[in-house]
Amino acid sequence: MKQNIKLGVIAALMLIVLTPVTSNAMHIMEGYLPVKWSIAWGVIFIPFFLVGLKSIGKIVKQDPKKKVLLALCGAFVFVLSALKIPSVTGSCSHPTGVGLGAIMFGPSVMFVLGTIVLIFQALLLAHGGITTLGANAFSMAIIGPIISFLIFKALKKKDGNNAMPVFLAAAIGDLATYTVTSIQLALAFPDPSGGVMASAIKFLGIFFMTQIPIAIAEGILTVIVYNLITENGEKSILENNDKGVKANEC
């Protein structure tokens, strides 16, 4: 437990130090993408969102208590993704937080939770935008969780410490998000001489200067929260939720 606390403090300090007081937008800001790309990413995103809604409905129907853990995973995404570092013009770097929910519930749940976070931040915090919601959701709420889930599933141990699989899942999922964002920006703004590939490499180079340390810090925080939930947190949260429901009924 003491080791977890120490690691948590270190990771939190890394995020605080790397995050300035002011920043611009989440991933790709409002109006930055050409209309055709905004529409295209929105169309691609919608089927994933519908699958996510169905998945959440199934989880809640099977075990209503899981709503608390779903909310916790959503809050984790909201808090981490609110920390921003200006990076490429029209975009920024930040933790994503989607790995935790993908590991615990599967990637489809994060299709919805990640999108809800993006909508709230676009409307309330002026981070990101509605016209770029499809593109931002595809990178952070879809690709990031899928990669995190696949890595955790491939590396997890049935009996043993899963700290490293969780760390790698969260960190690489974070980096995957920004790899996709770089490709999205490159498709919209190809290099005049080198085309899409050259543009993507440039975006990746700028993003990863800030994103690699952020991904490491996110991986550490995700391990700590995951351990707290799986070791004793889940039971405690569900029990507290039951008490709250009973109190309201009285």
Curated annotation (Swiss-Prot):
List where in the cell it is found: Cell membrane
**Statement: the UniProt record of this protein carries the keyword Transmembrane helix:** yes
Q: How does it sit in the membrane?
A: Multi-pass membrane protein
GO process terms (BP): cobalamin biosynthetic process
Q: In which pathway does it act?
A: Cofactor biosynthesis; adenosylcobalamin biosynthesis
Where does the chain cross the membrane? 33-53, 68-88, 100-120, 132-152, 163-183, 205-225
Q: What keywords would UniProt list here?
A: Cell membrane, Cobalamin biosynthesis, Cobalt, Cobalt transport, Ion transport, Membrane, Signal, Transmembrane, Transmembrane helix, Transport
Leader sequence residues: 1-25
Q: Which GO terms describe its molecular function?
A: cobalt ion transmembrane transporter activity
Any one of the GO CC terms: ATP-binding cassette (ABC) transporter complex
Q: Name one Pfam family in it.
A: CbiM
Instruction: State if Transport is listed as a keyword.
Output: yes
NCBIfam families in the record: cbiM, PRK08319.1
Give the record's subunit note: Forms an energy-coupling factor (ECF) transporter complex composed of an ATP-binding protein (A component, CbiO), a transmembrane protein (T component, CbiQ) and 2 possible substrate-capture proteins (S components, CbiM and CbiN) of unknown stoichimetry.
State the family it belongs to: Belongs to the CbiM family.
**What task does this protein carry out?**
Part of the energy-coupling factor (ECF) transporter complex CbiMNOQ involved in cobalt import.
Name the UniProt record assigns to this protein: Cobalt transport protein CbiM
Please report the organism this UniProt entry assigns to the protein: Clostridioides difficile (strain R20291) (Peptoclostridium difficile)
Highest lineage ranks of the organism? Bacteria, Bacillati, Bacillota, Clostridia, Peptostreptococcales
